Amino acid sequence: MKLRLSDTLNSLMLGGLLMASTFASADNKPTKPYWQDVQVVAVNKEYPRSSFMTYENRANALTGKFEKSKYYQLLNGTWKFYFVDSYKNLPANITDPAISTADWADIKVPGNWEVQGHGVAIYTNHGYEFQPRNPQPPTLPEANPVGVYRRDIDIPADWDGRDIYLHLAGAKSGVYVYINGQEVGYSEDSKNSAEFLINKFVKPGKNVLTLKIYRWSTGSYLECQDFWRISGIERDVFLYSQPKAALKDFRVTSTLDDTYKDGIFKLGVDLRNNGSTAGNMTLVYELLDANGKVVATGEKATNVAAGETRTVSFDQTLPDVKTRTS
C-alpha cells in the first residue's frame, strides 16, 4: 500500500499539548459515574492528533476543504433535544433508540443550549458558577443539567471495511456517546476535539447517534475563565473514514541552520495498521511552496504489524529559504 501525504493532509496544528488524563475502557467502568470521577476524563477516546482529512486523490486534498473528501460526512444541522434541570430527572432509558422523540425539542448544532431556550446562561469572571463560595473539588451540584442530543446517521456502503471515526470538535462539559443504544465512550476537556473509533457500533445504512451531555463534570474545575458559562455542542460534529492501514498522525519541525540561510525540515509520520495481518506500506510526502511548487519530497517503505503503529521520519535541508520574523 502506498500512502501519499499530500493526498491525506490538508491542515496542521502546531503547538504543545500537556495531558494529565486517564484513558479508560468502557469495559472497566468505575464505581462513580464518569462525570463525577476525577480519575476519568476519557473513555475509549482516540489519542489527540493533528488536524487533517483523508482524501481519495491529490487534487481534492489540495483544496484544503474537508467536504471535498468522499470519506467525510458533516453532522451539523437540526438535531432532536431533550433537556432536564437535574440529572436525577433523566429517564433511565433516554439513550434507547426505540423511544420516540416526537415530544423532544429541535436544536441547532453547533450551538449552546442556553441561547436556544434551555437552561440559564451564567457570566462570571472568576470562581465556579456552580459553587461560587467555598468550592470542594471534585464535588458537583445535584442540580446538574443534562442535554441529550439525537439524530440518525447514515454509513455509506463504500465505507465498509474501513475504520470509521466520530469527531466532536467541541462539546461542554462531560459527553457520553451512544450509537444504536450502546455506550461508545466518554470525553471531558471540552475545548479540545474528541474522536471515537465506532466500527463495532455501526452497521451500513441508518444508525442512531445519541450524545448525553452534562453541564458540569469534574473537568469543569479546570474551565474557570472569564467568559459566559454555557453548555452543549459548540463546534462541528462529523464522521470520517480511513483504510485499516492509514496515516494516524504527523509532526513537522522547521528551523534554520547556523547561517540562518538554509532551512531544516523534519517530518515524523505515524502509520497505524488496524488490520488483522501485517502490511507493507509506502509513505510518500511532498512539501509545496506558496505557489504550489514541490520543493521537497521523499519516499520510504516499511512493514507495520497488525494492531501496531510505526513512525516514519524524514529530514531534508532546504537551501536559501525565504525567512521571516514575527
Model-predicted regions and their roles:
Residues 27-74, 78-80, 87:
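N-terminal pre-domain segments of enzymes
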Residues 179, 262-303, 310-314:
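Beta-strand-rich binding/interaction modules
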